[in-house]
A protein has these predicted regions:
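Membrane-embedded beta-barrel scaffold of Gram-negative outer-membrane proteins
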Residues: 262, 365-383, 507, 515, ...
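A beta-strand signature from Gram-negative outer-membrane beta-barrel systems
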Residues: 153-154, 194-238
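Transmembrane beta-barrel wall of Gram-negative outer-membrane proteins
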Residues: 243-272, 282-322, 343-365, 422-424
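Surface-exposed extracellular loop regions of Gram-negative outer-membrane beta-barrel proteins
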Residues: 318, 324-331, 440-445, 492, ...
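Gram-negative outer-membrane beta-barrel transporters
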Residues: 475, 575-579, 598-690
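Extracytoplasmic beta-strand/coil segments of soluble accessory domains associated
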Residues: 146-184, 207
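C-terminal beta-signal and adjacent terminal beta-strands/loops
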Residues: 4, 684-690, 712-762
Length: 762
């Protein structure tokens, strides 16, 4: 596999250097479309006029036809200024583009001021439940080195164990990098799937999922456009060095350059800390972690309408598993002997090659994306000491524990094909996703007084998704997004489902959109999720493999209202209801913090969420508030040796990640004539998780934290240094995230950490 990645890198670099053609913008491949008309105040079309679309890092231009129509088929998600200069005057509008959305705008040229005759929000693909973070916004956030911390800023998402984002009451998010899928199992690893320092923009869907997305756990969809936050384009690079409390230090090297018409973006990152995972003790023991990652993107324009792009990522992370050595701690009954040295190492490699052809009239495109991913998770348990660990029971007796060594390798290969075509009132997209996974797993369980349990397994699985969707602009004020998706999966278990999706957006008043959505979702468990837990946890009377984990099937409904106050200020409120059968849920594996997956026979989450988002030259801010109730019942499958259909008691009880109120807010203010100096205040609030699992009794106390960052962005033009001083958990507020209950380990949040970073550009 290493040789493959090296050979692919050399081949693509050679092709990029050898080919030459006219340049087009090297846009990433997570896009929507913009189309419209340009007219005068007399409603007559204006032809042969230049229309320009300008965003954070993208500038696109086109010319209107004789009928005044214009189109941009591939526009990366984000906020844009749309403008046109004509003999009759100027026309302009501010618009927001979401992935897979079609934005229709009617520009009217006037001698004094430009305006849109129809609000751009009117026909957005997702006027609610979609939020985007630009490079400028990301760079100013205090915890912008953690993708989970960014995702958890939006409504509907709760920060759970080990910073896992739980979206709308369910585990598992779908991640995409530059338009290519990044498969992830529900039993996720500790490391980051994508280093956010390599991101130029992040978009998060928590609802209104288009038919394009599906097949795996989909509490939310996270789209990432690569490029980094430091530079605004062109050639150049930067070196960032940082150090701070808790043994923290990090380094980042980036380089953007061109060779012929090819554009290269290279990033190298490394970091370490003495406080990695949430610890079972207030003062952490054995909790260091480190990570390195390398990312390369090559974009090669091949004419005015063709683009070839290549992504290559390599990551490594190592985590000491924190321990509790105090037998008298009532919050942490699992006790390890001093010196226990369990370690998890994680390796990840990813490569994708995308080819995009845009039609001559700008109203369509075709994309082909082959991709590969290799992932290895190795848990190296300190077996001799692990079997000396024990759990203190309520009556004062103790129960001895087991030791675990695990080495799991998953290899993925996939192909994504899609085609898009827009007309006056319709935007049709269809595609197919093919994925194959090969899993090799080796487990050793050492049990005091019993023979070792050894389980070596290998399996192959597939996922196939086929979809078609249409964005129909029914009237000037109503748009309908309808889609149909078919998913089929094989592996230890298999299944299939036909999933309709329907979304209606109605501008009921000027700049106010009523939104409704209905969708069916299908989630196949990854091969990594399906293991012999019943044997490993000694709940089965036989050593025969039992693979009874079933695919999850959801019905999701939402009703919302969005209002655009100005082009830089919008708000929405959204009510959601999600019901599921065979919920893919998680519990701890033995006495480790690793996740094992099981089924709940039924599950339901209901809630109401609010978002206020503002962005201007001087201020970036956002407020999110969610009230929700997540319940499940009928524990079965995986660890529990009976199929979901035979569960006797399916009374709904609060999930262990159920949190009644969750709030997030951030405020960034920019200063100085060049607006490069900034200060950000960020806050988080939660009312606490249940103490036990699905028993309905007891809650941990409410908690809150505040983070701060101040700094100045580096100036690559004048070659001036940049710096950032960030403070996580400003007031050093400590709280219990979870307590050990058989499904979760005890976890304390991290103490205050101050980190200073300096950036030298060139």
């Amino acid at each position: 596999m290493v040789h493959f990645f090296r050979a692919a890198l050399v081949a693509v670099a050679f092709v990029a250097l050898a080919l030459g053609s006219s340049a087009v913008p090297a846009n990433a491949d997570v896009v929507g479309s913009v189309r419209g008309t340009l007219t005068g105040t007399d409603q007559h079309p204006i032809g042969q006029a230049t229309v320009t679309l300008t965003g954070d890092r993208t500038t696109l231009s086109t010319t209107t036809g004789t009928d005044g129509r214009f189109a941009f088929a591939r526009v990366p998600f984000g906020h844009y200024a749309l403008s046109a200069a004509t003999p009759q005057g100027a026309a302009s509008a501010g618009i927001d583009v979401a992935s897979d959305a079609t934005v229709t705008v009617a520009l009217v040229a006037t001698p004094v001021i430009g305006r849109t005759s129809a609000s751009s929000t009117t026909v957005r693909g997702t006027p609610v439940a979609e939020n985007a973070f630009s490079a400028r916004r990301l760079a100013a956030l205090p915890r912008n080195d953690k993708l989970d911390a960014i995702v958890e800023q939006v409504p509907g998402i709760v920060q759970f164990s080990y910073d896992e984002p739980v979206a709308h009451g369910f585990h598992g998010l779908t991640y995409e990098l530059d338009g290519a899928p990044l498969p992830q199992s529900t039993s996720s690893n500790f490391g980051q799937l994508i280093d956010p320092r390599n991101a130029a923009a992040v978009e998060i869907f928590t609802g209104a999922f288009p038919a394009e997305f599906g097949g795996s756990r989909q509490g939310a969809v996270v789209n990432v456009v690569s490029g980094g936050t430091e530079l605004t384009g062109g050639n150049g690079g930067a070196l960032t060095l940082g150090a701070g409390e808790q043994g923290s230090d990090d380094a980042r090297l980036i380089e953007h350059f061109t060779a012929g018409h090819a554009q290269f973006s290279l990033a190298l990152n490394g970091s370490r800390t003495d406080r990695g995972l949430d610890s079972p003790m207030l003062v952490a023991q054995h909790d260091a972690s480190s990570s390195t990652d390398q990312f390369l993107r090559i974009a090669l324009p091949m004419g005015e309408r063709d683009l070839l792009a290549f992504d290559l990522s390599n990551q490594y992370a190592a985590f000491q598993i924190p321990i509790n050595t105090n037998p008298n701690d009532p919050n942490s009954p699992l006790v390890s002997v001093p010196g226990t040295d369990d370690v998890q190492q994680e390796y990840d490699r990813f490569a994708s090659l995308s080819f995009t052809h845009t039609s001559k009239d700008g109203n369509g495109y075709v994309r082909v994306v082959p991709w590969m991913r290799w992932d290895r998770i190795a848990y190296d348990g300190d077996l001799d000491r692990d079997v000396q660990a024990f759990v203190v029971n309520g009556d004062g007796t103790t129960t001895p524990q087991n030791g675990l060594r695990q080495d799991r390798v998953a290899s993925y290969a996939g192909l994504r094909l899609s085609a898009y075509r827009a007309s006056d009132r319709h935007a049709l997209k269809f595609g197919i996703d093919l994925q194959q996974e090969n899993l090799r797993s080796s487990d050793l369980i050492q049990m005091a007084g019993s023979p070792d349990f050894i389980d070596d397994a290998a399996a192959r699985g597939t996922q196939t998704g086929i979809y078609v969707e249409d964005k129909w602009t029914a009237t000037q004020h109503i748009s309908v997004n309808a889609g149909l998706r078919y998913d089929h999966s094989t592996g230890y278990v298999g299944g299939a489902q036909l999933s309709p999706r329907l979304e209606i957006n109605d501008e009921i008043a000027r700049d106010t959109v009523l939104h409704a959505y209905y969708g069916r979702l299908y989630a196949a468990p990854g091969l990594e999720d399906v293991r012999r837990d019943a044997v490993i946890t000694q709940t089965s009377p036989t050593a025969s493999p039992v693979y009874d984990l079933q695919p999850e099937r959801d019905t999701y409904v939402e009703l919302g209202l969005a209002h655009t106050f100005t082009s830089a200020l919008r708000a929405y409120v959204n009510a959601f209801d999600r019901t599921a059968i065979n919920v893919l849920d998680t519990t701890q594996l033995d006495n480790t913090p690793l996740f094992a997956v099981f089924n709940n026979a039924v599950g339901r989450v209901r809630g109401l969420e609010f978002r206020l988002d503002a962005s201007s030259a001087h201020v970036d801010s956002g407020v999110s508030l969610t009230n929700s109730h997540a319940e499940a019942g009928g524990v079965s499958g995986g660890t529990f040796l009976f199929p979901p259909g035979s569960a006797g008691d399916i009374t709904l009880q609060p999930e262990d990640h159920d949190q009644t109120w969750t709030g997030n807010a951030f405020y960034t203010r920019r200063f100085g004539p060049d607006l490069r100096t900034f200060a950000t205040l960020q806050a988080e609030y939660g009312t606490g998780f249940p103490v036990q699992f699905e028993n309905g009794d007891g809650r941990l106390p409410a908690h809150w934290i505040a983070d701060v960052s101040v700094g100045r962005a580096a100036d690559p033009v004048r070659k001036r240094l940049g710096y950032t001083l960030s403070v996580d958990n400003l007031f050093d507020h400590r709280y219990l995230v979870k307590v050990n209950n058989g499904f979760n380990t005890t976890q304390w949040n991290a103490p205050r950490r101050i980190v200073f970073r300096i950036t030298a550009p060139w």
